Design a protein with these regions (language model features):
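Alpha-helical segment proximal to the catalytic Tyr-Lys
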Residues: 128, 171-175, 242
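Conserved glycine-rich cofactor-binding loop
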Residues: 9, 16-18
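Active-site helix of classical SDR
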Residues: 123, 158, 166
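C-terminal helical subdomain
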Residues: 182, 204-244, 251-253
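Substrate-binding pocket helix/loop in short-chain dehydrogenase/reductase
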Residues: 99-100, 104-112, 213
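Residue(s) in the substrate-gating loop at a strand-loop-helix junction
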Residues: 142
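Short C-terminal tail/terminal secondary-structure segment
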Residues: 147, 234, 245-263
Length: 263
């Protein structure tokens, strides 16, 4: 299916690795122009190698998104260069395990800022241009917003707020033809996830832990792939989803909604 994303300018945060990279590569395959904001250049060489299998028309910016005031200038520069901005993917963030018992309110607030404020600022800065293009916003959220995890209060709060903002922005911008949706991720295999699994010990212990997790995923008892998240994001950014807004889309193999008895 042609998603008609050829030449569309899409800004993606956290796009060098993991879910963000999966989204960027899918956009590149569809002919879009990804503008990627990433905190570190650590994975840049591999990222460039992979994206250039599909396109050489893309931009990268190195920015710690905690430096909120530096987000709008990137948006302005992008618009000045291309004359249009057609979509935003808010993806960057980290589950930092700031739990209820040991996290001070200052640490809680800092975590919220790192996982939420840049979502707001990027869309805030891009709104005039999204109205011009009748563009689309995709916010990446997490199952922790709905299920909890037990030891990550700040991250869960930020991801819950992202779902609220998705509905709010969809309502605020519907009259301008701008669509806003969220993808809710559960258990997705990424480099960070792989690093976490390694903390459980030797290879046998890692496999055992992974089996406990995948057994709870009803569809095929496997992890979601970054490519599957990328496919959904590309669809939501495209005109093929032209009457879809304000939705929380669960790309999770039924993890959140299906009866645990199925596992």
């Amino acid at each position: 299916m042609d998603l008609h994303l050829e030449g569309k300018v899409i800004i993606v945060t956290g796009g060098f690795r993991g879910i963000g990279k999966g989204i960027v590569l899918q956009l590149a395959q569809e002919g879009a122009i990804p503008v990627v904001i990433n905190r570190s250049d650590k994975a840049m060489d591999e990222f460039k190698h992979d994206i250039e299998q599909y396109t050489t028309t893309y931009d990268t910016y190195l920015l710690d998104l905690n430096d909120t005031d530096k987000i709008a200038p990137i948006v302005e520069e992008t618009y000045k260069k291309y004359g249009h901005i057609d979509g935003i993917v808010n993806n960057a963030g980290k589950n930092d395990n700031k739990d209820l018992e040991t996290t001070s309110w200052r640490e809680f607030e800092e975590s919220i800022h790192g996982n939420l404020t840049h979502y707001y600022e990027l869309v805030h800065a891009a709104v005039p241009y999204l109205k011009e293009s009748k563009g689309s916003v995709v916010n990446i959220s997490s199952k922790t917003a709905l299920t909890g995890q037990g030891k990550t209060s700040a991250y869960a709060a930020a991801k819950g707020a992202i779902l609220g903002l998705t509905r709010e922005w969809a309502a605020a911008l519907v009259g301008d033809g701008v669509r806003v949706n969220a993808i809710v991720v559960s258990e997705c295999w990424t480099p960070l996830y792989a690093e976490w699994i390694k903390t459980f010990g030797d290879e046998e212990a890692q496999k055992a832990r992974l089996s406990v997790i995948t057994d709870k995923i009803p569809l095929e008892h496997r992890m979601t792939t970054t490519e599957e998240i990328g496919n959904e994001a590309a669809f939501l950014l495209s005109d093929r989803s032209s009457h879809t807004t304000g939705q929380w889309v669960f790309v999770d193999g039924g993890y959140v909604h299906l009866d645990r008895a199925l596992s």
